[in-house]
């Protein structure tokens, strides 16, 4: 999972063939349900699915805590509604992974209490730097999550794209929404945050550690 250079900070949607910038984070939403999938407890690769669902659940939980911290500081400011809209989508992501945890009997990471505290602290701490700091955090985190989701998509495509079709569609949908949040952060002056390049690199290093640990613990 690489950290993109802050100087250029390209719009990540351009890296996706056929991506359409006009689909905003507040636009049309696609419902994904596990109704006709070939995925069952008997025919899936339990190790792969457990790992994917556990880490994604942890990531969406952490993202929710980050936005909660940002709203605690900036909720009454002009950027509050923007943050709230992104947070609402993250709540939907977390709800879906909560359902998948039950459906596929996946235990959560033992690090949930830690992500609870650190996520809120990261959100509130960067928000104390102002709108730009909060948006820099959003750009860093959402970029990391999008790269992580891309890695999972490659893994499932190599495993069995037909069997995991609906899980693939879900991850792709969430990946696209994270990229939209990334672009919203750039549109709201993330790059004007104090020491933007350093801040982004530190946050993304933390994301890589969190992903590594949540997959395994």
UniProtKB/Swiss-Prot annotation:
Binds 2 iron ions per subunit. One of its GO terms (biological process) is determination of adult lifespan. Pfam families: COQ7. It catalyses: a 5-methoxy-2-methyl-3-(all-trans-polyprenyl)benzoquinone + NADH + O2 = a 3-demethylubiquinone + NAD(+) + H2O. Residues 48-217 are annotated as: 2 X approximate tandem repeats. GO terms for molecular function: 3-demethoxyubiquinol 3-hydroxylase activity; 3-demethoxyubiquinone 3-hydroxylase (NADH) activity; chromatin binding; metal ion binding. It is linked to Coenzyme Q10 deficiency, primary, 8: An autosomal recessive disorder resulting from mitochondrial dysfunction and characterized by decreased levels of coenzyme Q10. Patients manifest neonatal lung hypoplasia, contractures, early infantile hypertension and cardiac hypertrophy, secondary to prenatal kidney dysplasia, with neonatal and infantile renal dysfunction. Clinical features also include progressive peripheral neuropathy, muscular hypotonia and atrophy, and mild psychomotor delay with hearing and visual impairment. Its main location: mitochondrion. GO terms for cellular component: chromosome; extrinsic component of mitochondrial inner membrane; mitochondrial inner membrane; mitochondrion; nucleus; ubiquinone biosynthesis complex. Residues 1-35 form a transit peptide. Belongs to the COQ7 family. Changing residue 216 to A: Loss of function activity. Its EC number is 1.14.13.253. This is NADPH-dependent 3-demethoxyubiquinone 3-hydroxylase, mitochondrial. NADH binds at residues 51, 212, 216. InterPro entries: Ferritin-like_SF, Ubq_synth_Coq7. Fe cation 2 binds at residues 90, 142, 178, 181. Expressed dominantly in heart and skeletal muscle. Catalyzes the hydroxylation of the 5-methoxy-2-methyl-3-(all-trans-polyprenyl)benzoquinone at the C6 position and participates in the biosynthesis of ubiquinone. Catalyzes the reaction through a substrate-mediated reduction pathway, whereby NADH shuttles electrons to 5-methoxy-2-methyl-3-(all-trans-decaprenyl)benzoquinone, which then transfers the electrons to the two Fe(3+) centers. Its cofactor is Fe cation. Component of a multi-subunit COQ enzyme complex. Interacts with COQ8B and COQ6. Interacts with COQ9.
